[in-house]
Amino acid sequence: MGLEKSLLLLPLLVLVLGCVQPSLGKESSAMKFERQHMDSEGTGSSPTYCNQMMKRREMTKGSCKPVNTFVHEPLADVQAVCSQEKVTCKNGKSNCYKSSSALHITDCHLKGNSKYPNCDYKTSNYQKHIIVACEGNPYVPVHFDASV
């Protein structure tokens, strides 16, 4: 009797796992933003910061990402930008917001002679306003548009 129940429940289990599984490994836009742009604990002060972080945050897999910015502020402060000054995004969309104050950021630029898989970055630290695109519910950053 136990075996019959197990055999009857197996197709149901397969069906449920088939529906749930595809979403398990999928990184949301908000999670991708955090992985690619947030470093609340860091300062970016080391000359090798960008080389280390770009690799650690998986932005040198398959190719070298040419430019990236890390924000060294609490996540809540960056999320709050989504309720600050509304501006037009570089792509013309209207879901971008500019921070009301300058934030501590690190820009990483791929050096001209650098070739994959040896991605070599120039590290530059700034205090600048950031512009982020926001989406979702809750309304959170999903794209780093610029720093000004």
From Swiss-Prot:
<comment type="function">
    <text>Endonuclease that catalyzes the cleavage of RNA on the 3' side of pyrimidine nucleotides. Acts on single-stranded and double-stranded RNA.</text>
</comment>
<dbReference type="GO" id="GO:0005576">
    <property type="term" value="C:extracellular region"/>
</dbReference>
<comment type="subunit">
    <text>Monomer. Interacts with and forms tight 1:1 complexes with RNH1. Dimerization of two such complexes may occur. Interaction with RNH1 inhibits this protein.</text>
</comment>
<dbReference type="GO" id="GO:0050830">
    <property type="term" value="P:defense response to Gram-positive bacterium"/>
</dbReference>
<feature type="disulfide bond">
    <location>
        <begin position="64"/>
        <end position="119"/>
    </location>
</feature>
<protein>
    <recommendedName>
        <fullName>Ribonuclease pancreatic</fullName>
        <ecNumber>4.6.1.18</ecNumber>
    </recommendedName>
</protein>
<feature type="binding site">
    <location>
        <position position="90"/>
    </location>
    <ligand>
        <name>substrate</name>
    </ligand>
</feature>
<feature type="active site" description="Proton donor">
    <location>
        <position position="143"/>
    </location>
</feature>
<feature type="binding site">
    <location>
        <position position="32"/>
    </location>
    <ligand>
        <name>substrate</name>
    </ligand>
</feature>
<dbReference type="InterPro" id="IPR036816">
    <property type="entry name" value="RNaseA-like_dom_sf"/>
</dbReference>
<feature type="disulfide bond">
    <location>
        <begin position="50"/>
        <end position="108"/>
    </location>
</feature>
<comment type="similarity">
    <text>Belongs to the pancreatic ribonuclease family.</text>
</comment>
<keyword id="KW-1015">Disulfide bond</keyword>
<keyword id="KW-0964">Secreted</keyword>
<dbReference type="GO" id="GO:0016829">
    <property type="term" value="F:lyase activity"/>
</dbReference>
<dbReference type="Pfam" id="PF00074">
    <property type="entry name" value="RnaseA"/>
</dbReference>
<dbReference type="InterPro" id="IPR001427">
    <property type="entry name" value="RNaseA"/>
</dbReference>
<keyword id="KW-0732">Signal</keyword>
<dbReference type="GO" id="GO:0004522">
    <property type="term" value="F:ribonuclease A activity"/>
</dbReference>
<feature type="active site" description="Proton acceptor">
    <location>
        <position position="37"/>
    </location>
</feature>
<keyword id="KW-0255">Endonuclease</keyword>
<keyword id="KW-0540">Nuclease</keyword>
<feature type="binding site">
    <location>
        <begin position="65"/>
        <end position="69"/>
    </location>
    <ligand>
        <name>substrate</name>
    </ligand>
</feature>
<dbReference type="InterPro" id="IPR023411">
    <property type="entry name" value="RNaseA_AS"/>
</dbReference>
<dbReference type="InterPro" id="IPR023412">
    <property type="entry name" value="RNaseA_domain"/>
</dbReference>
<feature type="disulfide bond">
    <location>
        <begin position="89"/>
        <end position="96"/>
    </location>
</feature>
<feature type="binding site">
    <location>
        <position position="35"/>
    </location>
    <ligand>
        <name>substrate</name>
    </ligand>
</feature>
<feature type="signal peptide">
    <location>
        <begin position="1"/>
        <end position="25"/>
    </location>
</feature>
<dbReference type="GO" id="GO:0003676">
    <property type="term" value="F:nucleic acid binding"/>
</dbReference>
<keyword id="KW-0378">Hydrolase</keyword>
<feature type="disulfide bond">
    <location>
        <begin position="82"/>
        <end position="134"/>
    </location>
</feature>
<keyword id="KW-0456">Lyase</keyword>
